[in-house]
C-alpha cells in the first residue's frame, strides 16, 4: 500500500508565490484525497492564511505520513509552531518533521542573463536544446500545440522559450505559449487546460510538486515523465548533481520513493546527503543528520520489501 505523503514547502515571504486563496488549498487537498499519494502546499504564516489552513486541514483526511522540508531556515523557525499546531489537531498518526538547510551550493543557471552566458552554462543549454527538440518532435507526431511553463522572470526561462520559438520555425500547425507558476496553479485547479509540455529550470520543488499533485496517472520513464496529455522534461534540463538547494533534493527523494524509482532515489539521496552535509558544517545543525537518516530509512522500506519479495520468488 502506498504511503500518503503531504509535502509542505515553506518559502520566504514572497507574496507573489504564496497560495493565497481558500479555493486553491481545497483544490489541492481534493486532488490529494483522490490520489492518496501526494500534495503540495506553500505556507504563509499570516493570521488570515493560518486560520484558513487550520480550518481546511481539520476537515481534511487523516495523513498517514507527512514529510516536511524547509528551503529557508528563517521561514522554518516561523512556521514550526504553526505546523505542530495543525498536525497535532489534524492527525494522530506518526509523521516525520524536520528541517533541511539550504545548501551553499548554487546552480549558475539561476543567474543566466541574456547578454552574459558563462561557460559553465553550456551543458545546461545543450540539455535545453535536447528537451526542446524532443518536445517539438512529439508535438509534430500528435499535431498538438505546446504550452511551455517556465519561470517567467528568469534568464534561463527566456532562453528556453526562445529555443522553442527557434525550433518551431515554420511549423505552422504547432504554436508555443508561455505560462508562469501562478497560471500553473489555475491549470491544476481545472480553470485552464493542463500544459502539453513543462520545462523546469532551478525551481524543481515548486514546479514538480504542483505538477505531481495534478497528474491523473503515475509518471513513468527516466528522462521524461509521461501522463496522458503532459510530458515533463525534467532530467534533460536539470541534472541531479546541479540541484541548487536541499529542499529540491528532498522533494526528489520523497517522490522517487513514492514512485518506487530506485534510480531517482539513489541519485537524489546521494546528492541530498552530500549537500546537507556541507550545510551542517556551516550552520552547525547537526541534529538534521539523524532526521535525514530517519527519512531515508522510512521511504526506503517499500523498495527494500519489494526486492526481498522478488528474491523470494526466484528461490
Protein language model regions, located:
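Glycine-rich phosphate/diphosphate-binding loop of Rossmann-like nucleotide-binding domains
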Residues: 4-23, 116-180
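Structural/interface elements that position substrates and couple domains in central-metabolism enzymes
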Residues: 16, 22-51, 63
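Active-site rim loops that border cofactor/substrate pockets in soluble metabolic enzymes
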Residues: 45, 158-203, 207
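N-terminal glycine-rich phosphate/adenylate-binding segment common to multiple enzyme folds
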Residues: 45-116, 203, 207
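Short, acidic/small-residue loops that bind anionic groups at enzyme active sites
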Residues: 82-104, 172-179, 221-236
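Glycine-rich phosphate/pyrophosphate-binding loop and the adjoining helix
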Residues: 116-142, 146-147, 275-315
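Glycine-rich phosphate/nucleotide-binding loop
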Residues: 189-280
